[in-house]
Amino acid sequence: DLAKTAPELMGKAGALIVGEPTSNEPLLGHKGAFWLKAQANGVTAHGSMPHLGDNAIYKLARAALALEDFAFDTPAHPLMGAATLNVGTARGGININSVPDAAELTIDIRTVADQDHAHIYRCLCNKLGSHIQLSTLLDVGSVYTAPTDAWIQDVFAVCAQHLGVKPVEKTVSYFTDAAALKAPLG
């Protein structure tokens, strides 16, 4: 909370170590997490008269299929790999014999270094069209330090001395506290 409420107290840092379950292997960063909710609205009607309604689940189903083949316009990162998109949940309707007037799904996007979440949002809005409303649930940027960084080189050298082998240069797909601490620490 200090990073959010009083960033001026954090000071500047030359390096940051975040404790994560990595089997004591140093990591160079993590992917970002961009979670969205996609909502479709319709008009309810009795299930025996669907022509009097507007089925929100049909709209949402088309959106889910469009998301399945969404292509990011950012190339894969050499260590982080490619950005990913997953539809995690879908909900809609109130019962079997009604045309649903609302439906929603959640989207979990994992981004690579320097990928712009606002740009992804705009691309998804264009892809899904005006029948789908997007809202942001979580927006956590990626964190990455190049393996050529002097401090990283020192860390890898110390690890090599103690472990007998130089650590592998890698990142992880989950996000860590480093994302929250990066901005206030400079």
What are these regions, as identified by a protein language model?
Residues D1-W35:
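Acidic/histidine-rich catalytic neighborhood of metal-dependent amide-processing enzymes
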Residues V18-P21, L28, W35-G186:
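Metal-dependent amide/peptide-bond hydrolase catalytic core
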